[in-house]
């Protein structure tokens, strides 16, 4: 079964900032995941419940979920390999602090 793909604004902006060839390669990898042709690796520790899509120097943090129209793949955050998890963890912490304030 094919998953519906939902991109966050950050992922959309990140993909838009890439060169056309790089953007095309990442989009192709996303479609492979949605079609069940490419597995995602689960993340652990503070990012349990999320998965990663690896492609060259980039990483995308994703999660599986449901929409009213069926199963979906949520593309949550994307960045370069060396910074993606640290930045995403910081973003999560900021959102938690704002929700409590």
Where are these predicted regions, by residue range?
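Arg/Lys-rich, positively charged N-terminal/basic patches that mediate binding to nucleic acids
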Residues: 1-29, 101
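Enriched for short, Lys/Arg-rich terminal
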Residues: 2-4, 55-58, 64-101
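Residues that form or immediately flank small-molecule/cofactor binding pockets and catalytic motifs
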Residues: 10, 48, 80
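Residues that form generic nucleotide/phosphate-binding pockets
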Residues: 14, 29-32, 87-90
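Short histidine-centered beta-strand/loop micro-motifs
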Residues: 15-17, 42-45, 64-65
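Conserved catalytic core of Hanks-type protein kinase domains
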Residues: 17, 32-33, 78
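A short, surface-exposed loop/turn module that caps and links secondary-structure elements
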Residues: 28-54
């Amino acid at each position: 079964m094919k998953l519906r793909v939902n991109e966050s604004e950050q992922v959309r902006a990140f993909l838009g900032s890439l060169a056309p060839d790089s953007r095309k390669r990442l989009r192709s990898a996303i479609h492979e995941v949605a079609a069940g042709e490419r597995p995602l690796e689960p993340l652990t520790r503070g990012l349990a419940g999320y998965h990663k899509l690896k492609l060259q120097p980039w990483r995308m943090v994703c999660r599986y979920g449901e929409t009213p129209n069926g199963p979906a793949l949520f593309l949550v955050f994307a960045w370069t390999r060396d910074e993606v998890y640290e930045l995403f963890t910081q973003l999560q912490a900021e959102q938690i602090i704002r929700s409590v304030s």
